[in-house]
Regions:
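Hot-dog-fold acyl-thioester-processing enzymes
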Residues: 1-65, 128
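HotDog/MaoC-like acyl-thioester-processing domains
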Residues: 70-128
Length: 128
């Protein structure tokens, strides 16, 4: 997670919180002593890492939502990885698609859990 990643994201999304934007504030008020990443950025990067695996390439139809918990801060300089597990799948009324539930675990370079999520997606099915 680079400073550029954080600054670009907070400017793009309008995250005006001094914790993300103002290094003088960070130096004075943050318990971390360096810039923290918004949880939304951590989630977005995790989704990008998953997309890069090709796991759902060409099959994704819709992101249906889910639940996310921020467990620990992600700070400038951290390196992230994602573990993904299919925890449920079900057919829909339409034979060309199904609903898949994934559990995501985002870990930093010290293998500390920083974010966990349970996500549902509509996925294209192979037809017989």
């Amino acid at each position: 997670m680079s400073e550029t990643d954080i600054v670009t994201f907070v400017n793009l999304c309008g995250f005006t919180e001094p914790l993300f934007m103002d290094m003088e504030h960070v130096k004075k008020a943050s318990v971390f002593g360096r810039r923290a990443a918004p949880g939304a950025l951590t989630f977005a990067l995790a989704e990008g890492l998953i997309m890069q695996t090709g796991l759902i390439h060409g099959t994704g139809m819709a992101y249906l939502g889910g639940e996310m918990r921020i467990i620990a801060p992600v700070l400038e300089g951290d390196t992230l990885r994602v573990e993904v597990e299919v925890v449920d799948k079900r057919e829909t009324k339409k034979p060309d698609r199904g609903i898949v539930t994934y559990a995501h675990r985002v870990l930093n370079q010290r293998d500390e859990l920083v974010l966990e999520a349970r996500i549902q997606r509509m996925i294209r099915r192979k037809t017989a």
